[in-house]
Amino acid sequence: MKNQICLVLAFSASLFLSHQSVAKEKDSAFVPFYFSTETLGSTIGLAGVAKGVGQPQAALFGMGLYSEKDSYVGFLSAFNYALSSNLLFSTQMYQARFNDNPYYLGDQGSNGSSTEDKTITNGDEENYKLEFKFLLPWGNVCEHGLLGAFQPIRDVSFASPVESGVSSIIFTPFYSSRELDIYNDKKEEATGFSLTFDWDNRDSVRNTTRGSHTSFDLTTGAESLQSEDLWLKWEFQNSQYYSLGPLGDWFDQQVLAFDFYTADTPTWNQCDGTVCSRPPEQEQVRLGGLYRLRGYTAGRYHGRSAIHYSAEYRVLPDWQPLDDIPLINYYDLPWWQWVAFVEVGRVADNYDLKTLHEDMKWNVGGAVRFQVEGIVVRAEMAKGADEGTFRVMINQPF
């Protein structure tokens, strides 16, 4: 398990909290934790969340950890502060130091690279984001106003964003940097912004049975605000969910979930001498981690473009023993879910559909997911051709 998982866990928390309802769950929680991995060694940390801070739909989240290798991660965030009846503000701040950490640099992250071909070095990482989310007056927001964006159960009878779901335009200025010792402390920096159209037409964020979720994202940036070497990246993602109903006395619910993702960097080959309009590696199109090619390390593959497919079979078993287990039954655990999934995808240095569908990487896996105090916790194992992972995290992958 790579140390970057801790960062992505925090981002997963932000994705989930952005859809929280004003609910009956606990207003705050703080959890100390300990784990040990090959890259970090023995590690201790503390994570906490507070809901309804200042406004009923708002939330604060923070996490910090420190390892025996003197590596550390710090993450702070605030979500869903209403600046007006249709404008929400969120922010995320992340800093980390990783010592003796594996990185897949340059061609080490290409589709044809070997898992054993990696660079071990020390690295400092930073990432800061401001998010301004404008809720379009369509669908659920038109009918229910601001609270329509936070309803836990929605009617998704229509296949148009004007009539159904929650549609938004999101403007996100950002700054990120990575400084590796192997590069003699030269920083790889990116300053820019992304513009996203998002249509969330799922009947439930936590346990989706019907509907869809679609987003299109444009990101542009450069090394600094004064730089003329602007790069441009676009990403498209679409998820679809189909209910199969119950299965006798075995399963109360069956769902087929599919996800499609593709991305490209059109400025990749716009070069002036040795300088090309390309994002630094931490901002490139990436596969591997918590959401795509989950059998591989976070950011294992990166480059100009990518395509990725996921399919999941999700069931809620009729057998529910969790309420009878001491200590565990202290928490609100309304359901648990069994999942089988398969994924294929690849990166490439050109956006060519034929190339992107050749020599694709794959993994298969299984997961058990729980809703705990309103938060979806997932434990999953995935295995690819040359790598495998086991992770415990929060939030549905899509």
Which role does the model predict for each range below?
Residues 94, 100-257, 348:
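Transmembrane beta-strand segments of outer-membrane beta-barrel domains in Gram-negative
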Residues 30, 58-62, 87-93, 167-171, ...:
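Transmembrane beta-strands of outer-membrane beta-barrel proteins
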